[in-house]
């Protein structure tokens, strides 16, 4: 009887550990992006050095005004361009669009592609800081 109890306990522990591993994503990598505020994104831009800003809008929207140093990778091109233009999958990547919808889609796609440090901060319509044209 003690052996059966011991086996059941070991089985439950094993299943629990397996479940935790499955939830953490492939190889323990992040399985989601972090949503932050515009203020938090600005703080990162002011204090960090090693980050990339992705504008997930269209070329026309980008030309109307964008956050300084942002690179344009429209949300619908992330799959095709990320590997080439974003070779470091652990790089801090900040993502925005116009309202937040496309930046969420782009951030989800980046995570699916294996990027582990993605932060989405919504849309430029809520960006209270300077932009460049």
Q: Positions of the model-derived regions?
A:
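Rhodanese-like catalytic fold shared by cysteine-dependent sulfurtransferases
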Residues: 2-8, 18-38, 44, 51, ...
């Amino acid at each position: 009887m003690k052996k059966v109890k011991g086996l059941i306990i070991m089985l439950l522990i094993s299943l629990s550990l397996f479940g935790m591993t499955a939830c953490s994503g492939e190889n323990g990598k992040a399985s989601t992006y972090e949503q932050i505020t515009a203020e938090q994104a600005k703080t990162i831009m002011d204090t960090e050095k090693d980050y990339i800003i992705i504008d997930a809008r269209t070329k026309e929207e980008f030309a109307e005004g964008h956050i300084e140093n942002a690179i344009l990778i429209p949300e619908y091109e992330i799959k095709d361009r990320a590997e080439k233009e974003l070779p470091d999958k652990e790089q801090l990547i900040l993502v925005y669009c116009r309202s937040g919808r496309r930046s969420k889609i782009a951030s989800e796609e980046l995570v699916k592609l294996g990027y582990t440090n993605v932060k989405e901060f919504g849309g430029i319509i809520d960006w209270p800081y300077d932009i460049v044209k």
